[in-house]
From Swiss-Prot:
It is found in: Virion. Pfam families: Orbi_VP5. VP5 protein is one of the two proteins (with VP2) which constitute the virus particle outer capsid. Acts as a membrane permeabilization protein that mediates release of viral particles from endosomal compartments into the cytoplasm. Permeabilization activity is probably negatively regulated by VP2 and is triggered by endosomal degradation of VP2 and exposure to low pH. One of its GO terms (molecular function) is structural molecule activity. The gene is Segment-6. GO terms for biological process: symbiont entry into host cell via permeabilization of host membrane. GO terms for cellular component: viral outer capsid. Its main location: virion. Residues 1-42 are annotated as: Involved in membrane permeabilization. The keyword GTP-binding does not apply. It comes from the Viruses. Belongs to the orbivirus VP5 family. Keywords: Capsid protein, Outer capsid protein, Viral penetration into host cytoplasm, Viral penetration via permeabilization of host membrane, Virion, Virus entry into host cell. This is Outer capsid protein VP5.
Amino acid sequence: MGKVIRSLSRFGKKVGNALTSNTAKKIYSTIGKAAERFAESEIGSAAIDGLVQGSVHSILTGESYGEYVKQAVLLNVLGSGEEIPDPLSQGETEIQAKLRELEDEQRNELVRLKYNDKIKEKFGEELEEVYEFMNGAAKAEVEDEKQFDILNKAVTSYNKILTEEDLQMRRLANALQKEIGERTHAETVMVKEYRNKIDALKNAIEIERDGMQEEAIQEIAGMTRGVLEAASEEVPLIGAGMATAVATGRAIEGAYKLKKVINALSGIDLTHLRTPKIEPSVVSTILEYRTRAIPDSALAVSVLSKNRAIQENHKELIHIKDEILPRFKKAMDEEKEICGIEDKTIHPKVMMRFKIPRAQQPQIHVYSAPWDSDDVFFFHCISHHHANESFFLGFDLSIDLVHYEDLTAHWHALGAAQMAMGRTLSEAYKEFLNMAISNAYGTQMHTRRLVRSKMVHPIYLGSLHYDISFLDLRGNAQRIVYDDELQMHILRGPIHFQRRAILGALKFGCKVLGDRLDVPLFLRNA
């Protein structure tokens, strides 16, 4: 269990602090009044800060030594359905989620219409029965079937899809890690197809990157969504690799409405079982190797990163299948004896036993302080039910404070075994506010508002799904906390833009490119 409380870094922050530093006070005590007036000027404070740190460069640019403005790129692609909302705008978040759901439904239906026979041949006729049950077009024998059997078929079919997806991803990763001469014919074909997709993505990203402004955090605007999804899908389960409707595991599950059937019959929400359409580490690798060939080993790392999310989803489904469904069946039998209900149907009372509060679902939950809400907000990030982990990530942007802490697990009907470790969300939130209240840089009014906020519960602003694995999500959060250079690049622009950049860096990651600004050229053309 870990806890980190740090001050956030911004460009020019060291310059701003130069006048109040102990080193600056010593300098002021040894120089005359005229020199002190120079020191209090804008260029003077930069000069002192620069000289103290050994960099005359800061005199010209207003930056401290080592602070160079570079290009920063959020590792998502516009047009992929993964646009980043302002986390404090609940309406914006809900509208984007609903639009994505509608678009996905339409695309998944195309997959079912195009590949129905091949999918049934590979994963069994049970998929069609589940789909017909959900659509109300079930045959007489299916209607007579027990609802629990339909639920079992939906879970089993989903398990088959995730097993196959995991297997194919591991095959691709193993092929990429082998020497070219050691690959079988099938592995060579698989790697060649994958490399063709990477080249298509690389070309699209390179075109966008050339048009980026130097001094802004950017998102990559990609190709049309259909082409983008086809190009970024490592191994389609059915059909050609670059078809317009790709039969991915995600698309097959959506086409046959497996999660919806499971939710309708059991009350168990599995919408958190997601995989990224475009793996952020792939975008990062392409940006890193944009001027040279990408080695197979780097691509293998990206494939394994995406496979972590698939394996996490698979473990979650096995947890539901092996741990939760037997308890669900037992609850059904108990309810049947008490209420005398029909054996074929599942009573709503049974479903309600397995409902969990929205604030404990495996998502990124967003809260803000009741006062000074634009600046003081935090994320509560919860893992899949089988892992039962969570962490707190709080920000006070008015005084540049960040607080990360691993929290204790919640108990609920779908959770795994508990361990008494860590603190609760409420305890972490109160300590976060206490640290902000005691900060010397806060204004008197801000401190008063924080004291008031501490007396009441924070405002819940909704939740967002994350597509990457929880391990990668935690890694992104810790990088935001520890990486000063990343902080400098995401904490620029209007306050709502900074919040979006923080959320983007958390959900997808952020790549700070190594291209340094050509300062003489910049000043010459300014």
